[in-house]
């Protein structure tokens, strides 16, 4: 991954964390690495544990940020969330996977939250 892509991703994750806090989320952990993959943000929304994938784009020629989530990435997100829940003994909590789309193609960043993005809780 190029330096510029890493910096774009890091900026997107920082913007997303602040955005989520403003939406009432409590940020528990960022950049959580597990054998199954990385979880960008682990947060709590009310009683629900949220595993948040952040997608950031500077240019939209190839689609919106949320459209870049592949089936393989979805499978990794599910496996990572399950692993996190087991590791921290949180299986009793309701959970979901959310996406935050960060569009940096305009002078002002545009963020969008998609709760329960995979349609399962």
Curated annotation (Swiss-Prot):
It holds the Pfam family UPF0102. SUPFAM superfamilies: Restriction endonuclease-like. One of its GO terms (molecular function) is nucleic acid binding. InterPro entries: Restrct_endonuc-II-like, tRNA_endonuc-like_dom_sf, UPF0102_YraN-like. Belongs to the UPF0102 family. This is UPF0102 protein DET0781.
